Amino acid sequence: MFSFVDSRTLVLFAATQVILLAVVRCQDEEDVLATGSCVQHGQRYSDKDVWKPEPCQICVCDTGNVLCDEIICEDPKDCPNAEIPFGECCPICPTEQSSTSSGQGVLKGQKGEPGDIKDVVGPKGPPGPQGPSGEQGPRGDRGDKGEKGAPGPRGRDGEPGTPGNPGPVGPPGPPGPPGLGGNFAAQMTGGFDEKAGGAQMGVMQGPMGPMGPRGPPGPTGAPGPQGFQGNPGEPGEPGAGGPMGPRGPPGPAGKPGDDGEAGKPGKSGERGPPGPQGARGFPGTPGLPGVKGHRGYPGLDGSKGEAGAAGAKGEGGATGEAGSPGPMGPRGLPGERGRPGASGAAGARGNDGLPGPAGPPGPVGPAGAPGFPGAPGSKGEAGPTGARGPEGAQGPRGESGTPGSPGPAGASGNPGTDGIPGAKGSSGAPGIAGAPGFPGPRGPPGPQGATGPLGPKGQTGDPGVAGFKGEHGPKGEIGSAGPQGAPGPAGEEGKRGARGEPGAAGPLGPPGERGAPGNRGFPGQDGLAGPKGAPGERGVPGLGGPKGANGDPGRPGEPGLPGARGLTGRPGDAGPQGKVGPSGASGEDGRPGPPGPQGARGQPGVMGFPGPKGANGEPGKAGEKGLLGAPGLRGLPGKDGETGAQGPNGPAGPAGERGEQGPPGPSGFQGLPGPPGSPGEGGKPGDQGVPGEAGAPGLVGPRGERGFPGERGSSGPQGLQGPRGLPGTPGTDGPKGATGPSGPNGAQGPPGLQGMPGERGAAGISGPKGDRGDTGEKGPEGAPGKDGSRGLTGPIGPPGPSGPNGEKGESGPSGPAGIVGARGAPGDRGETGPPGPAGFAGPPGADGQAGLKGDQGESGQKGDAGAPGPQGPSGAPGPQGPTGVNGPKGARGAQGPPGATGFPGAAGRVGPPGPNGNPGPSGAPGSAGKEGPKGARGDAGPTGRAGDPGLQGPAGVPGEKGESGEDGPSGPDGPPGPQGLSGQRGIVGLPGQRGERGFPGLPGPSGEPGKQGGPGSAGDRGPPGPVGPPGLTGPAGEPGREGNAGSDGPPGRDGATGIKGDRGETGPLGAPGAPGAPGAPGPVGPTGKQGDRGESGPQGPLGPSGPAGARGLPGPQGPRGDKGEAGEAGERGQKGHRGFTGLQGLPGPPGTAGDQGASGPAGPGGPRGPPGPVGPSGKDGSNGLPGPIGPPGPRGRGGETGPAGPPGQPGPPGPPGPPGPGIDMSAFAGLSQPEKGPDPMRYMRADQASSSVPQRDVDVEATLKSLNNQIESIRSPDGTKKNPARTCRDLKLCHPEWKSGDYWIDPNQGCTVDAIKVFCNMETGETCVYPNPSKIPKKNWWSAKGKEKKHIWFGETINGGFQFSYGDDSSAPNTANIQMTFLRLLSTDATQNITYHCKNSIAFMDEASGNLKKAVLLQGSNDVEIRAEGNSRFTYNALEDGCKKHTGKWSKTVIEYRTQKTSRLPIVDIAPMDIGGADQEFGVDIGPVCFL
């Protein structure tokens, strides 16, 4: 791909990236940008910028200073009817000729209409000196259309046009009188300013108005007003302009030279003095068709045009003679299906289908190929004579003449008379596609197509960046009080701001409506005792006594119902940026916006298929009768002489017989469109010609021209103009849409874009004989020769020598449309040509099918700040609100009312295209704008990158106040404004509707659970307290549903003229202009047409078949064949490129249940349970095996004397011996086998101490028991401080019979020192952590200063308040928080109760209004706000609600919040709203937070 990109394109691309980066960097560093720039009326100007804020004032920005000067006008002398052109300062005399040509004396007027100069063409002047660059002027007010002025001064040389067809030779005329030009001050004094962009002429190009009929030449315009003294330009080298000589005779055609290599660009020449207006240059030869460009981006929808009245269908004219190819007809309906033809060659690429779903933006593609030639631009100056073109291709082979040696080409014969059209031949087989021909002449535009249905609505774009803050408008008068509006929903409360200074008293509001009767007052005091009367007789009961004195006044009654709403204060200054609220749900589709401005021209659409044969055209007008030439005698043929020099053209001879059709000559340059010819007389239809032989496939042609623009889409809603996104990759081809119905015939438009030749139209009525036309298509067959045997195809012959130039025939009448040529193969990419002029917008394309609505995309990253958008019109002055003093900076505020409408921000970056929405209803057509002044023609440049955003325009003049419109729909929530000045305390408003449930509040610390109080009896309604001060602004609530659209307000007056904008897009197609003056003589034309066919020679003998010739050049395009039969299925194509990722599919149906998975690996061992209860004693065990023999015991005491032994053998009696020694037990120490003899120690055991062995057994048993208990306590902890459990759930599992109570847990395990004491609910297994402290004392905590009520955070805002904490005082700080972090991880549910004790304070439901607007907010431990209403995940419930109204008695509301997001609990803060009055008190019991 890289090899195809011209290196210059890369350099240009790199440069644009650098510039773009620089621009972005400058936007980020506004202080750098501002150095040297100036600001006037809110508009920023760059250094050295020049502008005219008023017609008679001109200003310049000089390194940060604005220097303005008044324009001093000279009185026009001897001018009774001096005029001041619209938007100008000084009067001009319409008839006075300007005598200055230097540009320094008098400013030139606007460019006049072209003068009617019949035969005058002045000589081209030498180039003038280069002037310094001028500054871009502001856009002037639109002037009234002046009378037609004399020709303006010569403009700057335009780009050389591509050579047109040679025009007829006009006699050289004298130069025309110099006319008064437009305001060329910037041009004359400074040339072009590099910064001025496309608006270098100081005139904004408006849309092209309809061209009127050519008027008579106007009187010469008066000299323009005095211009500023320009800096003198460097002196140019004046060339002596000689007069133009008469045209010389055409020289003989030279051989075409080889193309030279492109030279390096020369240095810019110095600017010459302006020459007289040059003649219009010829249109250049259309380039060969290029390769099809990438699919263009869809243009913005244009505004809907008014449907023209349907024209009456004319009567069909008689069939005329086949003319030269006509303009392309409108696309017709598809014909009936033809018989299947033989398999044809590969066809041209088909139309692109309907747009596929939008893909993500692709990378920036390479520069596209040049587009088709646009519609004719305004008249350019004559370009330099182009180089001689190469010789044309060889024509088709002529019929065999009498054999002979070819003689040199003779001079052109006199024109012959037209032959009778031959009968239509039968259709030949389709030939192989020839090489692409030059594009045919531009056809007239087709009738206005039917407006397509409104396109689907796109997704909402990213919000634009906020614009610069506008200047403060003038202070408006205080408006009359509006009608009382319905009470708005109460905003959510913000956090408390610092206390503000008291504001000045505002004006008294209108009296409120009569309040409801107050409660009955207390009885008055007893009156004084009357004097005691004398006792009388008991009388009859007397009449009632006199009325007693009035008692003391009772307590004041409750305030009455709210009075009417006071005047709206003016919006406060913008507050700090609030926290971003959650994304609201998508609103309903808004009404269609007004038509957007005309978008940039889209890239051309693909060329449509040729339409069917058009209807017969109306007969043309009769052409002027030509002069009869003197009849020449036909001479006998002489011998072939050598070619003589070109003689002068002889007089026209008499009409000869119609010669045989010569081969087509080389293509001439495209001529200017001729005037419509007179209608021809009806000719017979010509026979279809014999199809030519199939030509060899042509070489790959050069890249084709840009395709026709697609049809104009209907007007879409006005979008914010974003910077141009990267081009997306082309979507896949969709199915071909059905052809729409033909619209009514529109008025004749100017020549449309270059079309491919259409099919041959029906012949028109034959007109009177015109002058000789261009070479026609091949005529009927000549005198029949004998059929020769068909020779083999010969080789391509070399190009023949150029023939002598023939006389240029007059333009013939336009013939019917020619046939459509086959599409050529794409050629190699040509070098980048000069930018063509901008084409007109094409007709609208067919609407794409509506795409599925895509899922809501994730929010994109915030884009770079766009440049400020254009200044919107100032709104009507609002009523003046009372001025208060600034309040202290508040904490988080509630959602403010919608702010005043800001100026539109600049467009943000374009997001990826959303899927098409459903079509919206048609918008009302906008009113027609005023006709703008005709802009000077700019040179068409290549498609530039998206321009940098323009500077912000100055604020418009405030319009008159319009009538009040109906209430509009609620605007989107604006960013919260800053705290406004406190107003005077207003009348209590009606209760608002129940608001949406808010976000969860911050978690508060929990307290010990209070005992459940019995419900108190409802007290009487107490008097309302004074209104509290404004609370802090709460976070933005969820967006409300979109209101109904209000009716449109009356249109405001036109604003003041804005500053001149950047160059506008090319306007819509104007009406056809008057024909221009004849052009200057063109360069020497190429070879002339072939002379008349000679008479048939005598029939020669049939020659032998020649050898096979090389393949001939492709023949001319044959007539369109019948539709072929469907071809055989082609071979399977190569695999296409990978498609783009499709849209997210809908979720599939649930799948079937999977097979049972394999058993997972065994989990890790659970924590050791608590020790079990001591079991009952076991049964006695059986005797164990005997142990080993123990060590020898201590020496025993001496034994008792043993019993006397049996009598011994009688011996000699001796004396008794002494006691024997003790037994040495060491002798038995080694014995361990008792079976070998009796246990030697068995007699000793009874002697040992009885306590030694049992004591040892007890110690071992105790140790074992202790170890067993420890192991059991690890396996089954008992919830003591020494042996804490991990959670209460573990305790419940190990000891299900235990009762609820306080236990110790250690969720993070490890050392037990940081265990915490909690309440275990053994019914549920919940672990409940106590708050510390667990109560907020009951008292009046807050005294409000203002009348607005807001939520006041207890721990963050209230003096003496605190955030709730949890755990035991005895633990180290943060211990409970750490353990709760682990506890949250071990739990899936959390719950907490808060009891709000109230006295004249609403906690949840406001019984008076029936809504939850005054409900308290809670703050969770992860800073989320928990509310009474709104998103169900962040809302709490009220288990008991005794704080519904003000009764003057203490009551309570029990709030419960349950969640599976354990990170939201515990509650750490509470924010009541209904507090601040002297009689409003509250207290809070914080319940424990429980995890399960």
UniProtKB/Swiss-Prot annotation:
Q: Region Nonhelical region (C-terminal): which residues?
A: 1220-1246
What is its subcellular localisation?
Secreted, Extracellular space, Extracellular matrix
VWFC domain sequence ranges: 36-94
Q: List the disulfide bonds.
A: C1288-C1320, C1328-C1490, C1398-C1443
- Per the record, where are the segments of Low complexity compositional bias? 197-208, 223-234, 321-333, 340-355, 366-376, 396-436, 480-490, 501-517, 627-636, 645-655, 711-741, 838-850, 894-910, 919-930, 1105-1114, 1140-1159, 1176-1186
| Signal sequence annotation | 1-26
Give start and end of each Fibrillar collagen NC1 domain: 1258-1492
Where is the segment annotated Disordered? 98-1255
GO terms, molecular function: extracellular matrix structural constituent; metal ion binding
* Residue positions, PTM 4-hydroxyproline: P664, P673, P676, P679, P913, P919, P925, P1186, P1192, P1207, P1210, P1213, P1216, P1219
Q: Where is this region: Triple-helical region?
A: 206-1219
Residue ranges with Pro residues bias = 163-178, 213-222, 438-447, 1204-1221
Domains (record comment): The C-terminal propeptide, also known as COLFI domain, have crucial roles in tissue growth and repair by controlling both the intracellular assembly of procollagen molecules and the extracellular assembly of collagen fibrils. It binds a calcium ion which is essential for its function.
Q: What is this protein called?
A: Collagen alpha-1(II) chain
Q: Which gene encodes it?
A: col2a1
